[in-house]
Amino acid sequence: PTEQAARCQTLIAEKNMNNWIETSGSPFVIVEQQYAHQWKGQENYNAICSVTDYLGKIYIDNHVLLVMGDEPMATRIVNKDGAILIIRWKYAPDYLTVEKLLENDIVNGIEPIEEVEVKWDSTELVLFDSLSPYCEASVKVFLSLQKTSCIIKTYLYQKDEVSLIIHSIQ
């Protein structure tokens, strides 16, 4: 590629790096926006430690809380073909490689490794770092679902030098 094309690719990669979020080493959690203030951070933290899967469902004050288990990973939210994809980066050589994969139907032909069924009271959710109380969380990503009940399928994408965990909310 020309020098200008290479510089352009670098700028695109730097721009796309801003689309990924990370925690301070604790899991991300997802809860309905109307109940998010009930999350007390350290006070509730032991409850999420019981989750050993990539995605687990627990209850705080009788409300569903989803926990992204395993190890903390850089995460990106993508809306694709009517589904919300939560992409978690295990490893890849660079951002551009992952971005190219996301242009296609990345989970096509892959069997889910986990499924979680969830019934919410509303369609407005928020994803945030579980370490802090919700009001102090530095990263908050708001999600809008099509309906209050959904199935979340988890896929392990592993090819060549790329490994991603993908949660598809349908």
Segments the model singles out, each with a brief description of its role:
Residues L11-I110, D160-Q170:
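Primarily secretory-pathway and cell-envelope proteins
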Residues L102-S138:
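Extended, solvent-exposed segments with strong compositional bias
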Residues T123, K159-D160:
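Beta-strand-connecting loop/turn residues
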Residues C150-I152:
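A short tyrosine-centered beta-strand micro-motif
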